[in-house]
Amino acid sequence: MSGTGVLLLTLLLLVAMAASDMLSSLIQAHERDSEESCKSYGGGPCPSGEDCCCPPGRSTGTCKRTCNNGSVCA
């Protein structure tokens, strides 16, 4: 195999490893959400750094670091 082929193969391997690490980090960040049940108006508080995220029109939700599809319970 030529030197260029070896270099390209090595570069491809490094890119694949970096992509795998990024995907693993994203999965771990998602799993760090506590997923504890919470309620607005006197429900259990969420851990520090998390909000109580409720689906639209609901007063019960789950604790998450970011409310993607819902909104922070009032």
From Swiss-Prot:
Probable neurotoxin. The keyword ATP-binding does not apply. This is Conotoxin Cal27. It comes from Californiconus californicus. May contain 4 disulfide bonds. Its main location: secreted. Keywords: Disulfide bond, Neurotoxin, Secreted, Signal, Toxin. One of its GO terms (cellular component) is extracellular region. The keyword Glycoprotein does not apply. Expressed by the venom duct. The cysteine framework is C-C-CCC-C-C-C. Residues 1-19 form the signal peptide. It is found in: Secreted. GO terms for molecular function: toxin activity.
